[in-house]
Amino acid sequence: MKEEIDAPVSTDASGTDLENARDQPSGEKPTAVDIYLVEWDGPNDPELPMNFPLWKKSLITCIFSTLTIWVTFSSSVFSAAAGITSKEFHVSVEVMTLGTSLTVLGFTVGPLVWGPMSELYGRLKPLYIGYAIFIIFQVPVAVAQNLETLMLARFFLGFFGTSALAIIPGALADFWGPVERAIAISLFSAATFVGPIFGPIIGGFIVDSSLGWRWTAWITMIPASFFGIIAFLTLPETYHPVLLQRRASRLRKETRIWAYHSRLDENTPTFGEILTKYLFRPIQMLFLEPILVCMTIYISLIYGILYLFFVAYPIAFREVRNWKSLGIAALPFLGILVGVLMGCLLVTIATRLWYAPKLQNGSVVPEDRLPPMIVAAILLPIGLFWFGWTSSPSISWAPQAIAGAPIGMGILMIWMQGLNYLIDVYLVVANSAMSANTLIRSAVGAAFPLFATAMYHKLGVDWATSLLGFLSIAMIPIPVIFYFYGAKIRALSRFSPKW
């Protein structure tokens, strides 16, 4: 029972090596008689990432979160330029919305590559490669003279940038314990939302200024490069199998005994195993696992709502309220940011006061993740109806902007606790569950902005947002049912271990 309690690895999503992470932190030597198999020298091994000092763990987490902010920032900053670029390239605003959608579509495909690479080569090599190429693809966006170049560059910067989103959650699991890991992941999750929320605000002021829309790419490239260099100079490798492989290589050179080897040397994942873990099994689980299906639908909805709002907010504040400045019209996004930070704080408190004591007493079950999600499921429709029905120009802008707070809280808490629940439920096949969730979620996030303009123009801000509110109400029973009946449903699963 204790092994299963310590096993859950919290993450935001996306095909990182969660399945291997559950066995890595123990630091215990295997009972096999192979004296040349290199393992950790017990749980207090100074090279074990779990034994990094607190300051080092915190610094690594902050750097990881900063990289995440700039990747997700890039996904939304271009939304502020949709209007002006539609005129420059002689297409509709809906077509230019593809600039945002294609980046999020890159988030869909990327984890299928970066997740396996992190298992084979460690965390840092694929992270650095992907992040560097993400930075490079800002250049064709900034200098594009035709629509095709612009759209292709937006897709590929999403594809390569998602190396951070795919690898960092698993890297955090390498050096944080179960309770502290949940708090570290909350910081990472907040970063995944802070970036896209700031994108339209900063992008709006850039487009309004004399710099022009092309500087939305340059302003992403400059700080992303700066923090990328800091990461390159400071981040250590944390993936346990690769560290042990390096130790084995070092021992071979020092002792001239060529028999020293690590588990990764003798059990390198095959291409077929990787395909099974990241593609075939996720598709199979989407057909067979009701918990995965329902949670994926719910998380995909809130992810789609977030990216839909990059279109809806300018309509609500520029068109309906007649705010002229793109930057000023994007400032109400700060309401969502406040909600995200409040949600992050509430999840951290709930983890400390509710989840951690149960974990310590050995009485924790996956459903203990769900109470904050149930609260969030109620907050989200409240915020959506609040936003929609305070959109009239005859009502002050302040109530509509404040409505972003419960929306942000709802999105963050549903996201975090929903993904944590999936990981706790599926444990050994957590990678496959997260790959399935990432695939569907990112596809929905890419699709929602494409119909947002037509929906809001046709229905109006009030009824269009109310439609989202009704959809979110329909989702409320999901965490409630799983809280009360999740154990019985898990007992029927082919993939969930017995708690």
Swiss-Prot record:
InterPro entries found in the cross-reference section: MFS (IPR011701), MFS_dom (IPR020846), MFS_trans_sf (IPR036259)
Residue spans crossing the bilayer: 58-78, 95-115, 124-144, 155-175, 187-207, 215-235, 291-311, 327-347, 370-390, 395-415, 443-463, 467-487
One term of GO molecular function: transmembrane transporter activity
Membrane topology: Multi-pass membrane protein
Pfam families: MFS_1 (PF07690)
Region feature (Disordered): 1-29
Alphabetical keyword list: Glycoprotein, Membrane, Transmembrane, Transmembrane helix
Protein name according to UniProt: Citrinin biosynthesis cluster MFS transporter mrr1
Gene that encodes it: mrr1
